[in-house]
């Protein structure tokens, strides 16, 4: 259960001096409107918490799709180069690890590391798995699903009987 910790009411007006998201996963990636005017969101209600709407490419959050034909993982790794990434399959799991050592950027020095693990569906063909990194930093891990002929879709004809059913009426 997530519990929002609020500053006392007399400190909410001093919001700029008491930042609410000092160290979050978007540290160093720019400011939101709520960072510039935090007192507007905190005076509405003590339980109001503004959600962060970001596009999929900017969120750092993965998306997993498992449909009838394939299994796909999309993961934003824009801060990592292919040499910084390791993707491996261990049993029924795929593990994606990214790490780059401390390096200098516009704001000082930064290092990043993440580790994600996803369960592979049992129907995925593990011999045909693939992984690619797009120019905009989106890692795509995919694999086709094995189609079992006994579980394939087939139409069942509906026949009409002339006599009434013997099902009990309610």
Swiss-Prot record:
The Phosphoserine modification is found at: 45
Protein's name in the database: Alpha-crystallin A chain
Q: Name one GO biological process term.
A: protein refolding
Residues with PTM N-acetylmethionine = 1
Primary localisation category: cytoplasm
The record describes its quaternary structure and partners as: Heteromer composed of three CRYAA and one CRYAB subunits. Inter-subunit bridging via zinc ions enhances stability, which is crucial as there is no protein turn over in the lens. Can also form homodimers and homotetramers (dimers of dimers) which serve as the building blocks of homooligomers. Within homooligomers, the zinc-binding motif is created from residues of 3 different molecules. His-100 and Glu-102 from one molecule are ligands of the zinc ion, and His-107 and His-151 residues from additional molecules complete the site with tetrahedral coordination geometry.
Q: Where in the cell is it found?
A: Cytoplasm; Nucleus
Q: Which residues carry this modification: N6-acetyllysine?
A: 70, 99
Q: What is the recorded function of this protein according to its Swiss-Prot or TrEMBL entry?
A: Contributes to the transparency and refractive index of the lens. Acts as a chaperone, preventing aggregation of various proteins under a wide range of stress conditions. Required for the correct formation of lens intermediate filaments as part of a complex composed of BFSP1, BFSP2 and CRYAA.
Q: Which residues bind Zn(2+) 1?
A: 100, 102
Which ranges does the record mark as transmembrane? none
Which Pfam families has this protein been placed in? Crystallin (PF00525), HSP20 (PF00011)
Post-translational modification remark: Acetylation at Lys-70 may increase chaperone activity.
Q: Which GO terms describe its molecular function?
A: metal ion binding; structural constituent of eye lens; unfolded protein binding
Can you tell me which residues are glycosylated? Answer: 159
Which terms in the GO cellular component ontology are assigned?
cytoplasm; nucleus
Instruction: Give start and end of each sHSP domain.
Output: 52-161
Renumbered to this chain, region (Disordered) spans: 144-170
* Residues modified to Deamidated asparagine: 101
């Amino acid at each position: 259960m997530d519990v929002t910790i609020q500053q006392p009411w007399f400190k909410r007006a001093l919001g700029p001096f008491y930042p609410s998201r000092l160290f979050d996963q978007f540290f160093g990636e720019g400011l939101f409107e709520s960072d510039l005017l935090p007192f507007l969101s905190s005076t509405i209600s003590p339980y109001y918490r503004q959600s962060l709407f970001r596009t999929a490419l900017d969120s750092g959050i993965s998306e997993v799709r498992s449909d009838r034909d394939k299994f796909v993982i999309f993961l934003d790794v824009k801060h990592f180069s292919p040499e910084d990434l390791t993707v491996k399959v261990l049993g029924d799991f795929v593990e994606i690890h990214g790490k780059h050592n401390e390096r200098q950027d516009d704001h000082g020095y930064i290092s990043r590391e993440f580790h994600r693990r996803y369960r592979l569906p049992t129907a995925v063909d593990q011999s045909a798995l693939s992984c690619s990194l797009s120019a905009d930093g989106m890692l795509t891990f995919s694999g086709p699903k094995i189609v079992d002929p006994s579980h394939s879709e087939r139409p069942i004809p509906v026949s009409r009987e002339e006599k009434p059913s013997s099902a009990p009426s309610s």
